[in-house]
Amino acid sequence: MSSIGTGYDLGLFFSPDGRLFQAEYAYKAVENASTCIGIKCEDGVILALEKVVTSKLLKPRVNNRIGSVDRHIGIATTGFIPDGQHIVKRARDEATSWRDNYGSPIPGTVIADRLGNYVQLFTCYSSVRPFGVMSFVATYDSEGPHLYMVEPNGVYWGYNGAAAGKGRQVARNELEKLNFSSLKMKDAVKEAARILYATHDEENNKEHEIEMTWVGVETNGIHTPVPDELLQEAEAYARRIADGEEEDIAMQE
């Protein structure tokens, strides 16, 4: 039974067959967006995002889609860009409020829970619409690294590896091959670049760039962009893999 076209997709209420179409449309916005991945390794977390360069007038590596929420927390979003910017701002407000009230950094699980609750509220009222973004939360604290993904309906889960966007299926297949328990941050940077190059659609002939951040032992627990030198090395590695030069790489190593 289909309820599309009968008005049930015009607001936030359930159709007779139990579907919430506005929430499903929010997922569609994410599915058609840039590929974003998160990798939780032994000593930290990597966030990586493919950004299509829509104009040659744009300054390279300036229009960031990954932001710091607190010193130890980073958030990457993919989907409807303004919604993602709002989610990052909301997360920063939550982190600031926690510090003001408790005098300590907000735990990763708390920020994920609060974002999930906030996003879920936008699926409950007819005067608003769901957020068309998937949010990746990367944190590092005394208990180690943590990676969460908050979905458009407010559900959030903890992950070792997560992917969303156009190339999500290819990315997930590649992530499943990784040994997260022994993977180091610098190696994870290379793997993240390789996976994003594997998901890139060459047919659209559009330039793209990779935005990547990390938090963990290598950064003394502070969320920062991956250094340019390391990112360029990782992208060169990914290009060689994409060009089918695996044997040459193995010989060099």
From Swiss-Prot:
<dbReference type="GO" id="GO:0005634">
    <property type="term" value="C:nucleus"/>
</dbReference>
<protein>
    <recommendedName>
        <fullName>Probable proteasome subunit alpha type-7</fullName>
    </recommendedName>
</protein>
<dbReference type="GO" id="GO:0005829">
    <property type="term" value="C:cytosol"/>
</dbReference>
<feature type="modified residue" description="Phosphoserine">
    <location>
        <position position="104"/>
    </location>
</feature>
<dbReference type="Pfam" id="PF00227">
    <property type="entry name" value="Proteasome"/>
</dbReference>
<dbReference type="GO" id="GO:0019773">
    <property type="term" value="C:proteasome core complex, alpha-subunit complex"/>
</dbReference>
<dbReference type="InterPro" id="IPR000426">
    <property type="entry name" value="Proteasome_asu_N"/>
</dbReference>
<dbReference type="InterPro" id="IPR001353">
    <property type="entry name" value="Proteasome_sua/b"/>
</dbReference>
<dbReference type="Pfam" id="PF10584">
    <property type="entry name" value="Proteasome_A_N"/>
</dbReference>
<keyword id="KW-0647">Proteasome</keyword>
<dbReference type="InterPro" id="IPR029055">
    <property type="entry name" value="Ntn_hydrolases_N"/>
</dbReference>
<keyword id="KW-0963">Cytoplasm</keyword>
<keyword id="KW-0597">Phosphoprotein</keyword>
<comment type="function">
    <text>The proteasome is a multicatalytic proteinase complex which is characterized by its ability to cleave peptides with Arg, Phe, Tyr, Leu, and Glu adjacent to the leaving group at neutral or slightly basic pH. The proteasome has an ATP-dependent proteolytic activity.</text>
</comment>
<comment type="similarity">
    <text>Belongs to the peptidase T1A family.</text>
</comment>
<dbReference type="InterPro" id="IPR050115">
    <property type="entry name" value="Proteasome_alpha"/>
</dbReference>
<keyword id="KW-0539">Nucleus</keyword>
<comment type="subunit">
    <text>The 26S proteasome consists of a 20S proteasome core and two 19S regulatory subunits. The 20S proteasome core is composed of 28 subunits that are arranged in four stacked rings, resulting in a barrel-shaped structure. The two end rings are each formed by seven alpha subunits, and the two central rings are each formed by seven beta subunits. The catalytic chamber with the active sites is on the inside of the barrel.</text>
</comment>
<dbReference type="GO" id="GO:0043161">
    <property type="term" value="P:proteasome-mediated ubiquitin-dependent protein catabolic process"/>
</dbReference>
<dbReference type="InterPro" id="IPR023332">
    <property type="entry name" value="Proteasome_alpha-type"/>
</dbReference>
